[in-house]
A protein has these predicted regions:
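Asp/Glu-rich intrinsically disordered low-complexity tracts
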Residues: 337-353, 357-361
Length: 375
């Protein structure tokens, strides 16, 4: 159960608690940090609970905050400056604050699989298979009889619309649909009309630099002993971002040059009208994408992915599965080659042993004749 008590062992001292989502924050990460920080206060947490963020706001998120009257969360660079930390909308250390391993994480509220997180102490972790972290937070509010005001309802609704692409993404569950409809009523907005307004704001990219476009919603994922990077943007007109593919590829390549452990970079352009994708793909592991979707990546690095719309449900698991298969095949092949080399070496040693033995015999024979000759 979500605790009403402070996790502090020193209850006389007010603590600073940071609540934040992942790097390159999207609307759900930002809204969830505000919603979760408010939940802590409503639950009676007497500490200084601060909603935070690890990066800049995108246009979609700015629109949602302004529409419902919220200020952006506090921008932070170090999580360990806080006494305690609450993570929302992520748990993967690679997607969190750079010093997350030095911070004291006390709670996690998420809707992703557990990915690389560990804690030496028992903590509260709630991650559920729904389309949005704010869907999980809505349930926590209801379970604890906390009233959801109009503006907080609007913020939760914005996150659900964003993460589920207006309830059309493969990640959408019936719980997301029911929650979104309830929140729309509380917020006093028409779900479809507001949803289209919000998503349209997120597709405006003409004044966004290539670097910011690539990293406004980008996540790193470990796959075996390698890493992949997947960025995603929404678009009503895929031609606009595709016309900028050269600049986008340059940003991606420069990033890979600096981060040698990234073996594949995918920049996904989601057509939110048809729910198809165009992906710009670079890196030595491009074959994983081709195998996953039975496609061939063009010389320009662009590939069409029919009915592929979700990074969480499709892109990451599909690509990871096939990359792991490639890694295993390479390991088997390497092992086979090593065994071949071992056999070659064994045969070489056997041959050398035979030659050495023959040489010994010849030497003994020669010495015998020399002895007889001198007698």
């Amino acid at each position: 159960m979500y605790s009403r008590e402070s996790s502090s062992s020193d209850l006389d001292k007010e603590k600073i608690i940071y609540v934040f989502g992942h790097q390159a924050p999207d609307t759900d990460a930002i809204c969830s940090s505000i919603i979760a920080a408010n939940l802590e206060k409503e639950m009676g947490n007497i500490n200084q609970v601060i909603a935070c963020r690890l990066g800049s706001l995108n246009k979609e998120t700015k629109f949602a905050l302004e529409y419902f009257g919220f200020q952006p969360p506090t921008l932070i660079t170090k999580a360990s400056e806080a006494d305690e930390v609450i993570l929302v909308d992520h748990n993967n250390p690679g997607q969190s604050a750079k010093d997350i391993k030095q911070a004291k994480v006390v709670k996690i509220i998420d809707h992703h699989g557990i990915a690389g997180f560990s804690s030496p102490e028992p903590i509260f972790i709630l991650t559920e298979p729904v389309g949005c972290c704010c869907t999980v937070l809505y349930k926590l509010y209801k379970d604890n009889d906390i009233q959801i005001t109009k503006n907080y309802a609007g913020l939760m609704l914005s996150a659900i619309i964003s993460d589920t692409v207006l309830l059309r993404s493969q990640t959408t569950t019936q719980r997301d649909v029911k929650t979104a409809n309830k929140l729309a009523k509380i917020a006093g907005v028409n779900l479809e009309e507001y949803g289209k307004q919000l998503l349209t704001k997120g597709t405006e990219i003409s004044d966004i630099a290539d670097y910011d476009l690539v990293f406004q919603d980008s996540k790193e994922f470990p796959v075996g002993d390698e890493k992949i990077q997947i960025s995603q943007i929404n678009s009503y007109d895929t031609k606009e971002p595709l016309d900028r593919k050269d600049g986008i590829k340059k940003v991606m390549q420069e990033y890979m040059d600096k981060h040698k452990d990234i073996v594949l970079f995918v920049f996904d352009i989601l057509d939110i009208y048809n729910m198809d994708s165009y992906a710009i793909v670079i890196g030595p592991r491009k074959k994983a994408v081709e195998n996953a979707y039975h496609v061939e990546i063009g010389e320009d690095g662009v590939v069409f992915l029919k009915k592929v719309a979700s990074r969480k449900k499709q892109l990451y698991p599909d690509i990871a599965h096939h990359l792991i298969n490639i890694q295993r095949k390479e390991k088997r092949s390497k092992l086979k080659e090593e065994k071949k080399e071992e056999k070659k070496e064994e045969k070489k040693e056997e041959k050398e042993d035979i030659i050495n033995e023959e040489n010994k015999k010849l030497k003994i024979k020669k010495n015998k004749y020399v002895y007889i000759y001198y007698i």
